[in-house]
A protein has these predicted regions:
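Flexible, low-hydrophobicity surface segments
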Residues: 1-107, 135-138
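Alpha-helical support elements that line or immediately flank enzyme active sites
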Residues: 1-15, 53-74, 155-222, 268
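General beta-strand structural signal in soluble alpha/beta enzymes
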Residues: 11-16, 47, 136-140, 167-169, ...
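Short acidic loop-to-helix transition motifs that present clustered carboxylates
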Residues: 17-21, 142, 174-175, 199-200, ...
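Gly/Pro-rich active-site capping loops and adjacent beta-alpha segments
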Residues: 20, 35, 62-88, 115-119, ...
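Short, solvent-exposed polar/charged micro-motifs at secondary-structure junctions
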Residues: 21-26, 86-91, 145-150, 202-206, ...
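Glycine-rich and small/hydrophobic secondary-structure elements
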Residues: 32-63, 203-255
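Helix-loop-helix junctions that connect adjacent transmembrane helices in secondary transporters/permeases
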Residues: 94-185
Length: 274
């Protein structure tokens, strides 16, 4: 209530003010392979930087002042930080909610901390490896990688003369963003128009919806124009990096060097959301 009294503040929203439907921010063709595991704002935050409120005001100065006046009380829950232990019996669930859903049958199971799982094989690899003269096995680790495009995430929204929500965004996926916003805001796609000007780089980072949902919600609620511009740090925190991987490879060969079998097991640290 103190933050709302800051001159120029238009609105402050928390998880109680937004639709409770879950959606995915992944820029994928419908039905998406990524699970519907996000909300615009969620009571259960899952990483440092997960949004807890939307503050809208006339200028950046008043918004920054209001942000400093917000007080958030956190109940600290047991963390799940090691992907190698993520499926253990007593490991905390990242998504315990009942309205989590996966549209495609790709082995996703939120009650097991699984975003996806798949197995494919040709022949009996274990039997062939057991019959090989030489078997080499090694486990490799790759770190998470994050893009650093010149232009950070940013979105501008307004309501046009037809009552449509217009979204102008630095994105690579205008039609996917339209569907994502429709799911997040619970409004028809026909009420949304997404435009993409020339963008200052993406490299795949802008193939997910990152910044669009927050000003879109503000504009849809207030019917006033809004925009958001992420800082470099915010862009690094909020977007989806290439996942950390643990890859175990077994290669079997004859003494003459002919490779007879290859077995690969990959564990991907997907993180807080799919």
């Amino acid at each position: 209530q103190f933050a709302m009294k800051v001159p120029g503040i238009e609105a402050i929203y928390t998880w109680e003010d937004v639709p409770q439907e879950r959606f995915t921010m992944a820029g994928q063709t419908y039905p998406e392979l990524s699970p519907y595991d996000r909300q615009i704002l969620d009571q259960h935050v899952r990483y440092v930087g997960d949004p807890v409120a939307i503050v809208a005001g006339e200028n950046e100065k008043c918004v920054d002042q209001a942000l400093k006046m917000l007080r958030v009380e956190y109940e600290v829950l047991p963390a799940n930080l090691d992907p190698r232990k993520a499926m253990d019996k007593d490991t905390p669930l990242v998504h315990p909610e009942d309205n989590w859903k996966a549209l495609c049958n790709i082995g996703a199971d939120n009650k097991k901390n699984l975003c996806a799982t798949e197995e494919t094989h040709e022949g009996d690899v274990d039997a062939v490896l057991a019959d090989c003269d030489v078997v080499v096995e090694h486990t490799y680790h790759t770190k998470a990688n994050q893009q650093a495009m010149m232009e950070t995430f940013r979105t501008y929204c307004f309501i046009d003369e037809y009552g449509r929500l217009n979204v102008v965004s630095s994105t690579q996926i205008v039609f996917h963003v339209r569907r994502i916003l429709s799911n997040a805001l619970c409004i028809p796609k026909s009420k949304i128009r997404v435009s993409k000007p020339r963008i200052g780089g993406g490299f795949g980072a802008k193939q997910s919806s990152i910044s669009e949902v927050y000003p879109a919600f503000v504009t849809w609620m207030t019917k006033k124009p809004s925009k958001i511009i992420f800082s470099r740090e915010e862009s690094q925190i909020a977007s989806s990096p290439r996942h950390e991987m643990q890859v175990t490879v077994r290669v079997g060969a004859n003494k003459n060097g002919k490779i007879r079998a290859i077995d690969v097991y990959t564990l991907s640290n997907t993180g807080a959301y799919g």
